Curated annotation (Swiss-Prot):
Signal peptide: none annotated. Residues 182-250 are annotated as: NifU. The lineage of its organism: Eukaryota, Metazoa, Ecdysozoa, Arthropoda, Hexapoda. This is NFU1 iron-sulfur cluster scaffold homolog, mitochondrial. One of its GO terms (molecular function) is iron-sulfur cluster binding. Its main location: mitochondrion.
Length: 283
């Protein structure tokens, strides 16, 4: 089949009247734990030193204007979305840093991983999603994250150095019609809704009727991610593309190994602290 016919099929998807959020929600059959009709909670912060306090004020950025940092809850209680009011990666772009060892290409990600309790960092078009370690308190993490984001955007440094945002849904010359339609549907109907929840879905491949996807950001460890993937994404893909038989979640084994090593290190550190004598003087 010619590329022109494939493009016609893609245009049909683009012209579908039902919006992306309605489609994903209706196919999933579940409501998000966050009320999307409510505006983001606005956290206005101001600081001068590293030990800054959280106040209801404006923060001058680069001597030009004030920065308002907003936060939005996500379906994952261990992930929080921060909106600095400026572009982070630009429209449609995302980048995932599941752990500190992957942050070498981003000065901002490196700084955020230095905040105690931060487990993962995810960049979107105009937001930063922070995932915290289990047991860590947002009340302690949020002020530090606010400070890092403000200081960084005041510095004028690039968010990313050499790495490029995800291009997994870019149409390639050797893509067949089914793959092209999967990519188009993911890019125009599914990913925008997932990104609103502070995460992303990355296309990893298609073979023998199985679409392989990787969850990122707040979606990677969200309790409802499997339900969303199967009941929402899979049903939508099957509705438009009969060739799709199922959807599978793909995990990065390297990321799993790093997370496992980090958790073991954390446990050893806690054990050592518990073994330290609590008395003030020599026994």
């Amino acid at each position: 089949m010619s590329k022109f016919l494939s493009q016609a099929a893609l245009n049909t998807l683009r012209n579908t009247r039902l919006g992306s959020r309605q489609l994903v929600r209706s196919f999933a059959g579940i409501a998000s734990t966050r009320n999307h009709s409510e505006p983001a909670r606005q956290e206005e912060v101001y600081g001068q030193a590293r030990g800054r306090s959280l106040l209801q004020m404006r923060m001058p950025v680069a001597g030009r204007r004030s920065m308002f940092i907003q936060t939005q809850d996500t379906p994952n209680p261990d992930s929080l979305k921060f909106l600095p009011g400026v572009d982070v990666l630009g429209k449609g772009n995302t980048y995932d840093f599941p752990n500190g060892t992957t942050a070498h290409s981003s000065p901002l990600a490196k700084l955020l991983f230095r905040v105690e309790g931060v487990k993962g960092v995810f960049f979107g078009a105009d937001f930063v999603t922070i995932s915290k370690q289990e047991g860590a308190e947002w009340s302690l993490i949020k002020p530090e994250v606010f400070a890092v984001i403000m200081d960084f955007f005041a510095s004028g440094l690039p968010v990313l150095h050499d790495a490029q945002p995800n291009a997994d849904t870019e149409i390639l010359e050797d893509d067949d019609e089914t793959v092209m339609m999967i990519k188009e549907l993911l890019d125009t109907r599914i990913r925008p809704t997932v990104q609103e929840d502070g995460g992303d879905i990355v296309f990893m491949g298609y073979e023998a009727g199985v679409v392989k996807l990787k969850m990122q950001g707040s979606c990677s460890s969200c309790p409802s991610s499997i339900v969303t993937l199967k009941n929402g994404v899979q049903n939508m893909l099957q509705f438009y593309i009969p060739e799709v038989e199922s959807v599978e979640q793909v995990f990065d084994e390297a990321d799993r190994m790093v997370d496992s090593e980090f958790e073991r290190f954390e446990k050893n550190l806690k054990t050592l602290k518990q073994q330290e004598p609590s008395g003030g003087g020599p026994q």
